[in-house]
């Protein structure tokens, strides 16, 4: 324990890397919503290539290594979507295509879990989706 902390800090989140005992450290999870046109229409959302919807999930929402994913509280409408996870080895901002490509460490398969009933209430009030998207165990992910 760090003596500067009044209690133990949580363990860092990391993901297995195929073919090595090393693990990939996770700092942030950025997500893009309404990026699949057919699914956006299915959800009665307007599809626009000009303005993607961004949201975040906390790193500790990740579930790895065949751990159980419990059914979350406060919902009766849990929805799942398969996702392509792009793991970046370096940060950046406003990157051109070549620099962005060079920042990619690898890829994984993920699952985006959403409490749709909570999301609908948030959308109706023009509120963020945090409670619908960023709950415990809402981001199962395979090895990179």
Regions found by a protein language model. Give the residues of each.
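Catalytic-core "active-site belt" of small-molecule-metabolizing enzymes
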Residues: 1-144
